Amino acid sequence: MGYEEHKQYQLDMRYLRMARIWAENSYCVRRQVGALIVKDKMIISDGYNGTPCGFENVCEDPDTGLTKPYVLHAEANAITKVAKSRSSSDGSTLYVTASPCMECSKLIIQAGIKRVVFCDDYHSKDGVELLRRAGIDIVQVAECE
C-alpha cells in the first residue's frame, strides 16, 4: 500500500470509529447504526437510526420486538440533515457502520455521494449492488476497530 492509499485508509478508519461512536446515540435495541457524511475532510452531517423528530424514542414494537416501520436509517437521517443545511453532499463520502439497504442506496445516489465506506453487511446486498451500478466507489473495511 502506497503512502496516499495508507493515508486514506487511516482516515477511513478514523471516520468509521466516529460513526460507531455516533451509533451509540441510537435508542434501537436490535441494531445501532451510525453514519457520517464527509466532504473535503470535514464532517458535514451525521445520523443514526431512530424515530423521526417528535416521536417517542422507541424503535421496536414492544409486542413483537420488530422494528417500527417509521424508524429512519442512519444514512437517511444524515442525508436529510445535510439537505436542511447550507452544505452540499455532492461528491462526498458516506461512512456508515453497516452497508446501506436498497432504500438508503437510492437516497445516496440522489444526494450525489460518490464514495461509501462501511464495516458490517446488511442482511441484503441489493443496496450495495445498486450503488456499484451507479458508479459509486464502495469500500468495505474487513476489520473495524
Where are these regions (language model features)?
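Zinc-dependent deaminase catalytic domain
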Residues: 1-145
